[in-house]
Amino acid sequence: MASQEIEQLASTLARLPGLGPRSARRAVLWLVKKRDTALPALLEALEGVQDRLVECDTCGNVDTQNPCGICADPRRDRKSICVVEDVADLWALDRARLFTGRYHVLGGKLSALDGVRPEDLNIANLLGRVEEGGIDEVVLAMNATLEGQTTSHYIAERLEEFPVRITQLAHGLPVGGELDYLDEGTLAQALRARRPVQ
């Protein structure tokens, strides 16, 4: 049986997304084994961001500076905005290094069941950014859920009054995916979005 402090650390780690009690205990044991190198580095990293984390006023990204590094980067294409549901989606897309524009984080998705309305999301700020001008394209990169598609449709309707191209991510078969393992919705979307062989 571990000490109360070690149990407290495991309990705290278990509250992180993706970590259950067993994974948290394994992480604690690893930290104990590597306490001379890993633990000080982890503490330093946590202390380094604890008081410096801010939400970007422009896009809603989380960073240690405001505006965030993406919004402040002069090499980014300022004429295109990719709209995502949350910061995790922004980070995933940016890791792929395929989109060179800037982002906009909604902070969620419309959901009648959860009582999330348009005014609960960061939509007004998006419309303000587009209204300022200089934006040629808005990419709607919502998840392929009913709520995500409802959110995309709502935003597309709100953007119709502006002279911008509105696009959305393609949905369908994942690379390496086998047809037998895919759900009917994914297969239907893949069939609807089929294109000529090149």
Swiss-Prot record:
Q: Provide the family line.
A: Belongs to the RecR family.
Toprim domain residues: 79-174
Tell me the SMART domains matching this sequence.
TOPRIM (SM00493)
- A GO molecular-function annotation: zinc ion binding
Q: What does this protein do?
A: May play a role in DNA repair. It seems to be involved in an RecBC-independent recombinational process of DNA repair. It may act with RecF and RecO.
GO biological process, alphabetically ordered: DNA recombination; DNA repair
Which Pfam families did the record assign?
A: RecR_C, RecR_HhH, RecR_ZnF, Toprim_4
Q: What is this protein called?
A: Recombination protein RecR
Q: Which InterPro entries match?
A: DNA_Rcmb_RecR, Rcmb_RecR, Rcmb_RecR_Znf, TOPRIM_dom, TOPRIM_RecR
Query: Where exactly are the zinc fingers annotated as C4-type?
Result: 56-71
Q: Which domain of life is it from?
A: Bacteria
Tell whether Zinc is among the UniProt keywords: yes
Q: Which UniProt keywords apply?
A: DNA damage, DNA recombination, DNA repair, Metal-binding, Zinc, Zinc-finger
* Record bears the keyword DNA damage: yes
